From Swiss-Prot:
Compartment(s) of residence: Cytoplasm
Name assigned to this protein: Glutamate--tRNA ligase 1
Key word Hydrolase present: no
GO biological process, any: glutamyl-tRNA aminoacylation
Ranges spanned by the short sequence motif 'KMSKS' region, renumbered to the chain: 249-253
Length: 465
């Protein structure tokens, strides 16, 4: 059975990069009729918080990325919080030590820092110098008796090559002499990502690992651990990272926001999944797709090796497409029942068909509810100046035209054209701004049908002031 996984650390809120990794793993599993697993990697005791843990799970559920195995689901391979798996890791540490494939390291952080500095100054890549690699049993006991707490290092074999096939990047080769012995247990007894991540993937039956390319150099180390313990090895695929438009790491200055913030601002889950699924993955269809359709079209071979550039406008495009396809009940659940309650029942259908194609967020709906049923709205400085420059006569003639022709916009515009000898923008724009406060938006003729006649009169009179 094919099984992919998403294993976030609960040290912060979920961001777009996390969400895309989760989505790709979900789509990959669904495309193969496989299992999507969630594991919480909370070994960083100081930074891991339960609020972040629950928030990550809430965000995944909101995105409809339901896991079949993990917290609150099938827990047959659990526990799925690494903080509860230390006894498992300790057992494998013991196996490695007994096989002389791991050894205690008493080097201080200062010693390691100095060693790296010397290596860099000599033009060599920084790696562990092997200071504690050959300590005798007596030397080890002496250091422990002195109260020194050792870390545990994996003994990397000399003069070998670690080779693996990456589904995105092809064959990868790493010289073990460039890796150096690495820490698999900290001096305080806790397990670093490198070790427990690999152990858990093997024990939980993960067959495929899709993760960011920043983990590429971790893979040979994890392969060495799994091979030493004779544990199954997953297939790896390292995906390109998301960057800003300028090619630098994605950040808030590029307009990137966390999933919770996007949700709170009215973004819809299907908009995010349609955007993220195409961020570094090619789809032939440019239509809004369901999660099932996205999964059907997902192919690891369609993942790009090049960094995926974040584009806020593209995200907003998919948001608008998603809003436009919402069933009416879902639309009002998203926009808010308090807005729906402000619309007279006899005008609800016309309002929805008129406004829906022109809104992207609940705040947009609120704006047009106020335009159609509110008393006043604030104009921007440039709009106020345009109305003043248009002159009172325009609005006086418009006032009279509405009295004469009612809500027939074509007749009103023809009247203005005849009386004022106007055409194009000068003919239409002042009327739209005076009545709606916006230069663009839904079809004006339909908005006028929705508005009360008194509202139209009042706004034309205000434009004369």
């Amino acid at each position: 059975m094919m099984k992919s996984r998403f294993c976030p650390s609960p040290t912060g809120l979920m961001h777009l990069g996390n969400a895309r990794t989760a989505l790709f793993n979900y789509l990959f599993a669904k495309s193969k009729d496989g299992i999507f697993l969630l594991r919480i990697e909370d070994t960083d005791v100081e930074r891991s918080k339960e609020t972040f843990d629950l928030g990550l799970q809430e965000d995944l559920r909101w995105l409809n990325l339901e896991w079949q195995e993990g917290p609150g689901a099938d827990e047959g391979n659990g526990p799925y919080h690494q903080s509860k798996r230390q006894a498992i890791y300790d057992d494998y540490y013991q196996r490695l030590e007994e096989a002389d494939q791991a050894y205690p390291c008493f080097c201080s952080e200062e010693q390691l820092r100095l060693s790296r500095k010397i290596q860099r100054s000599a033009g060599k890549p920084p790696r562990y110098a092997g200071t504690c690699r050959s300590l005798s049993a007596a030397e080890i006991e002496k250091k422990k008796a002195e109260g020194l707490q050792p870390a545990l290092r994996f003994r990397v074999p000399d003069d070998e090559v670690v080779v693996f096939a990456d589904l995105v990047r092809g064959e990868q080769r790493f010289q073990t002499n460039d890796i150096g012995d690495f820490i698999i247990r900290r001096a305080n007894g806790t397990s670093p990502f490198m070790f427990c991540n690999a152990i858990d993937d093997a024990l939980m039956g993960v067959s495929h690992v899709l993760r960011g390319e920043d983990h590429l150099t971790n893979t040979p180390r994890q392969l060495l651990i799994l091979q030493a313990l004779e544990l199954p090895v997953p297939t790896y695929a390292h995906i390109a990272l998301i960057v800003g438009p300028d090619g630098s790491p994605l950040s808030k200055r590029h307009g990137s926001r966390g999933i919770k913030e996007l949700r709170d601002n009215g973004y819809l889950p299907l908009a995010l999944t349609n955007y993220l699924a195409r961020l570094g993955h090619y789809y032939a269809s440019d239509e809004l797709l369901s999660l099932a359709e996205l999964a059907k079209g997902f192919n690891v071979e369609s993942l790009s090796k090049s960094p995926a550039k974040f584009n806020a406008q593209q995200l907003d495009y998919w948001q608008k497409q998603t809003v436009n396809q919402l069933p009416n009940d879902d639309f009002w659940e998203w926009a808010g029942s308090e807005l729906q309650s402000q619309i007279p029942t006899d005008k609800a259908d016309l309002f929805l068909t008129t406004v829906k194609p022109n809104v992207s967020f609940p705040r947009d709906v609120a704006y047009w509810v106020n335009v159609c049923f509110g008393k006043t709205f604030n104009l921007e400085t440039a709009q106020s100046e345009l109305l003043r420059a248009t002159g009172n006569r325009y609005f006086e003639e418009a006032f009279e035209a509405f009295k004469k022709f009612g809500k027939d916009l074509n007749s009103v515009v023809s009247h203005l054209k005849e009386k004022l000898n106007l055409k194009g923008k000068p003919l239409y724009q002042p009327l739209r701004i005076a009545l709606t406060g916006a230069e663009h938006g839904p079809e004006l003729a339909k908005l006028i049908l929705i508005m009360d006649y008194e509202t139209i009169q009042n706004r034309l009179q205000e434009a004369c002031q």
